[in-house]
Amino acid sequence: MRSKRFVLGVPFLLIIAVLLPARAQSGWTVEKTFHIGGDGGWDYVTADPEHHRLFVTRTTHTLVLDSESGRVLGDIPGQKTAHGVAIDPKLGRGFITDGGGTGAIIIFDLNSYATLGRIPTVPDSDGIIFDPKLDRVLAVSGDGGVLMAFKPDIDLTNGKIDQIKLDGAPEFLASDGTGKVYVNLEDKDVVAVVDLTSQKVVARWPVAPGGHPVGMSMDPKSHRLFIGCRNPQKLVVMNTESGKVESSVPIGAGVDATGFHDGQAFASCRDGSLIVAEEKGGQYDVAQTVKTPDGARTMTIDPAARKIYLPTAEFEPVTSGRPKAKPGTFMIVVVNQQ
């Protein structure tokens, strides 16, 4: 076949130069809100992209929602103070941290949502994740000051959970898939690096210029942690190999979770701001601030759908102190990328 040559004129090249950056910087916007209602507070929310589900803790129970419609698919009862959910889709098990009383991890079936067992832990069991490469469920206890680790197929009757002392009050965590776990110590303003093989803390890295570290997420490819800090309010970008703080981004008040997807970092804040940060010239900076309802302090990302889900509610007006949620107004705010 004879080849043909095409010459692009200057006006056409200018159009490309204008359109390509606009596409690369496409923004995020609130798409819709699922009005769920019901009783209970809330904490973390976890996405199951493969099955289009959301798991959201409601203090004494955990809701399972359809992530496309907001329809309630199930309700897992029997918790005292539910905090977070981790799932192992391959095994078909889910895990809920219950920080009430003496503490426990509730294990449930991902298909029927039936409770399979309750493994004793320590009080204030809180953040929880599943690392599929390590085949480990990892959780932390703020009051207990420990990192907990166990296999997802743990014996429901006699199973034991490894506990690693952290010398601090952990809030959330991330795992690199090779045996290193990174834990925010909120009271120490540091990240504790835990080696799961030796079951010891091998490093402590300050998060300054950020304040108390609470939210955490990770990009294993770039070896970076994204740490949401309070007082000062910063999204801190930390190198996981050296502990060096590479960037710090100003964020809103009351951050409680962060996320990372497709080159962008996110911080959800209680003051009704979802911060979107991007890397430019080796430094992260604010690319967009999405206005969300007040109280939307935690989040989860569905990378396939390119959506972010944030639980919150309507609040009673107050003159001072933290406002109380209006009964029956619980909702999930859905933010998507244009």
PLM feature spans:
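Intrinsically disordered, low-complexity segments enriched in polar/charged small residues
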Residues: 7-10, 24
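N-terminal secretory signal peptides that target proteins for export/translocation
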Residues: 1-5
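Predominantly soluble domains enriched in secretory-pathway, periplasmic, or organellar proteins
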Residues: 21-338
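Bacterial N-terminal signal peptides
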Residues: 9-18
